[in-house]
Amino acid sequence: MQTSDTRALPLLCARSVYKQYSGVNVLKGIDFTLHQGEVHALLGGNGAGKSTLMKIIAGITSADSGTLEIGGNNYARLTPVHAHQLGIYLVPQEPLLFPSLSIKENILFGLAKKQLSMQKMKNLLAALGCQFDLHSLAGSLDVADRQMVEILRGLMRDSRILILDEPTASLTPAETERLFTRLQELLATGVGIVFISHKLPEIRQIADRISVMRDGTIALSGKTSELSTDDIIQAITPAVREKSLSASQKLWLELPGNRPQHAAGTSVLTLENLTGEGFRNVSLTLNAGEILGLAGLVGAGRTELAETLYGLRTLRGGRIMLNDKEINRLSTGERLLRGLVYLPEDRQSSGLNLDASLAWNVCALTHNLRGFWAKTAKDNATLELYRRALNIKYNQPEQAARTLSGGNQQKILIAKCLEASPQVLIVDEPTRGVDVSARNDIYQLLRSIAAQNVAVLLISSDLEEIELMADRVYVMHQGEITHSALTGRDINVETIMRVAFGDSQRQEAAC
């Protein structure tokens, strides 16, 4: 963070930036400035225009009008190559790595020969506290480590303007602190950072200034110390919310055939001494009508466990019982038919077909059940139902999923999972990259689902989210669950963190 108001010329100054897509104005005369040695946080609801503005600055797309002043020079438009040459690097919310290449190859990919310094890369790895093997395949990394690799790519390019899009979305508190420490070191060298996030406590910790976007405009901007939390939330929230949003409470009842026949409290999913890649001897029971939280540090084995339950990874030992029937040998499709549905952590690579239409994506799992072929009119009607329930923002049902903002993509993925009529719904980081308003919509929906006696397994790195949502909580530590479920007053951030870090005293007390 900056400690002085003495500043040279701004690193970046965007003036009167306009952008339109398909006749819809997504940016309406944006002014945005970034100075040396400062963190300028950018907030806003889904579809507010944050990603579009950053893509224009990074040269990925061009503005219809307006200018970018960088280093004292004015530019009407940039290309990605030109942006890199000017020291601009965008670290995307969804890391864009080559999974079949090594970590080292990914970091060095596209660098000029003069920048190919192994010693520099090793120094950066050490400074960030990254423990991964440079020769391992990038595809073997979890989301948090892929995020670190993307940041390293930017640092290797001597970036002066670093754009971080939800950089802490999948990081643990300890990893976030380590990242912030490294960012402080970068700021001292004169680097400017645009920090896109929905986590207000983190923004207050790291940012010098805050700008809030709403409906393609800057609704609020100022020094962090001078803006209250109420001011920020009010600026993010639309002045008028659709009355149809309350349909999320009625959504489940409106979907024929989506009512599991289990009484509340009935055991629906039981794991008996499960062992697989990244976890061992995991036992737990998930009951109808409850939200069971699964917490733990990144790398604790939570996602690996979820993918094994859904049949995406090989089970090495133990039994998975769904409705008192073993499903160990069933395929993913057969598990889906029996009501086990999984919402993956990485929506872009695992959850959605980005080139397919929104309507097709929402009904993709039911297409498989009825012979794959889509019924356009029915799919469009289904999408409209979820649009009203989840307040999804889009222009037409035929548009590709990749054209939506990250938060609206997440809502499409949630709708896709709900349309598959789950009896057990496993949600892995369901609010990752989602703004405050949309997050509350998703929370309301998950509670509504559980109220219809669906069993919900909630995996989240956001411990406050776990505390708010879960009826019971298991914590994984180094691939194991070594304590009984937390309940009642024990479901709090402090207790969860102690268990996640292997607090033996807490574990013994809980058993």
From Swiss-Prot:
GO MF annotation terms: ATP binding; ATP hydrolysis activity
Keyword Isomerase among UniProt keywords: no
Reactions that this protein is recorded to catalyse: ATP + H2O + (2R,4S)-2-methyl-2,3,3,4-tetrahydroxytetrahydrofuran-[AI-2-binding protein]Side 1 = ADP + phosphate + (2R,4S)-2-methyl-2,3,3,4-tetrahydroxytetrahydrofuranSide 2 + [AI-2-binding protein]Side 1
Family annotation (SMART domains): AAA
Annotated binding of ATP, by residue: G44, G45, N46, G47, A48, G49, K50, S51
Span of domain ABC transporter: 12-240, 240-503
GO cellular component terms given for this protein: plasma membrane
EC assignment: 7.6.2.13
Keyword Protein biosynthesis tagged: no
Disulphides: none
Membrane-topology descriptor: Peripheral membrane protein
Origin superkingdom: Bacteria
Compartments reported by the entry: Cell inner membrane
Alphabetical UniProt keywords: ATP-binding, Cell inner membrane, Cell membrane, Membrane, Nucleotide-binding, Repeat, Translocase, Transport
SUPFAM superfamilies: P-loop containing nucleoside triphosphate hydrolases
Cited function: Part of the ABC transporter complex LsrABCD involved in autoinducer 2 (AI-2) import. Responsible for energy coupling to the transport system.
Subunit relationships: The complex is composed of two ATP-binding proteins (LsrA), two transmembrane proteins (LsrC and LsrD) and a solute-binding protein (LsrB).
Stated family: Belongs to the ABC transporter superfamily. AI-2 autoinducer porter (TC 3.A.1.2.8) family.
Protein name: Autoinducer 2 import ATP-binding protein LsrA
Organism field: Escherichia coli O157:H7
